[in-house]
Each structure stands twice: as C-alpha cells, then as structure tokens.
A protein has these predicted regions:
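Walker B catalytic acidic pair
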Residues: 172
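Predominantly extracellular/secreted Zn2+-dependent metalloproteases
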Residues: 1-166, 176-223
C-alpha cells in the first residue's frame, strides 16, 4: 500500500502516509446492504471445508468403493448447502424447534441430548471433508469426524428435500457430531422430522434459496 488519498468508511477523503498504510495495522471489513451478504455475515460457524475424492476419479467417473470423484458442480452445491445450514443455525425459530425435541433426542447411551447446546455444538465443529457418495452399492451417505459425504441427489435436491435427501444430509451431520445408530441423532427425529423439515419449510429465507440459482440439475457434468 502506498501514500495517497483514500475514502474512509464515513465518506471523507483523507491522505495517509505510507507508514500509516502498513498492512500490519490494517484490518479488512466488508460493508454491503445486499440481502445475501446480510444473511451470510450472520453465520457464526467457522467450518474449514475441503473437497476430497477418496479415490474416486472425477474425469472418468470411475468410483472407488463407496466414493465417486466429486466434481465442481457438486462443490458449488455443497457451498450453497453449508451456507444455508450455517445461516439456519443462527435463527431463533430453529433453536425453538430443536428445543421441542428435548427428551426425544437420545445419545449413544440412550440418555437425553441437551438440545440447548446442540446447535452451538454443530456450529463449533472444525469443518468437513466433503465427498460424493457412489450410490451403486446401496449407500446414500457416510459421515463421522470430519468426513461427510452424500449421494448426488442430496446435492441437487436439498432445496425441496426430494425423496428425503435432506434426511441423509442431517443423518451424516449427526455422525459428525459423534452419534452412532444407537442414538436418535442419525436414524431418528433429528434427521427425519426436525432439521430436515425445518430446512425444507424455511428454504425461501436462506441465502441460497432455489435450485434455479446454480442450475446444477441441468449441468452436463453431473453423473
């Protein structure tokens, strides 16, 4: 950065010396009144997201066991999906919805999950290694730790929860939260009745609220 005239946040134009423009003394702030930016700026989650092939070949389309090679079309939908989930976690009405399941959500030992901390636990996960599931083996999702993957339909049709694809999404997030199939956080009302239903019913209010934005369903690079 060089000495020069700069417009401040208040609108004034001031001259700053090169010393005053030292990058170490500056911070970045983005200001925008666009509704999309307003929504995503409210997201508290700091998930570090990677896209992984897990041995699948995205060029030839050859799967490796239960994994297809994820392609850019799926990565874009994953960004949309996790922006929506991150924003959903900030909504008071989602917390209220989750709280109604106190005593219904059970952990791996069949003890009640504290619903008052569930959303913050999800927000505080470190992130996800996102892959694409090959459904030819009868598998629609895999999750646990940082690993999170769903079949193609969940990436393309999460906007309407078509065929219960959102249940798969939140089932695998239940695994990422540390729950196994002995809990009700995978097979149970967390993924089938609470989070999936709320996502579908409130999609119009989310940052990426329609499949027509990315138009992935007509993308020639889907499987």
């Amino acid at each position: 950065l060089e000495k020069g005239l700069y417009r401040t946040e208040s609108g004034k134009v001031l001259q700053f010396s090169a010393e005053e423009m030292n990058p170490a003394s500056l911070s970045l702030k983005i200001a925008c009144n666009d509704p999309y930016w307003t929504k995503i700026s409210q997201i508290k989650a700091k998930w570090y997201i990677k896209f992984v092939l897990n041995g699948g070949n995205p060029v030839t389309g050859t799967p490796n066991k239960n994994w297809w090679g994820i392609r850019p079309v799926h990565c874009r939908e994953a960004v949309a999906l996790f922006l929506n989930i991150g924003y959903m976690c900030t909504l008071e009405k989602f917390q209220q919805r989750v709280s109604t399941f106190q005593g219904t959500f059970l952990d791996n030992n069949r003890y009640p999950v504290d619903t008052s901390t569930l959303i913050s636990r999800l927000e505080n996960l470190s992130g996800f290694d996102i892959g694409l599931i090959y459904s030819g083996n009868g598998v629609s999702g895999l999750g646990g730790g940082r690993t999170w993957g769903v079949y193609q339909k969940s990436f393309l049709y999460h906007y309407e929860n078509s065929g219960g694809c959102c249940s798969t999404i939140f089932h695998e997030l239940g695994h990422c939260l540390g729950y196994n199939h002995n809990s009700t956080m995978t097979y149970g009302q967390w993924a089938s009745g609470c989070a999936d239903v709320f996502y579908k019913n409130n999609i119009k209010d989310f940052p990426v609220n329609s499949h027509t934005i990315l138009k992935s369903r007509s993308n020639p690079n889907i499987y």
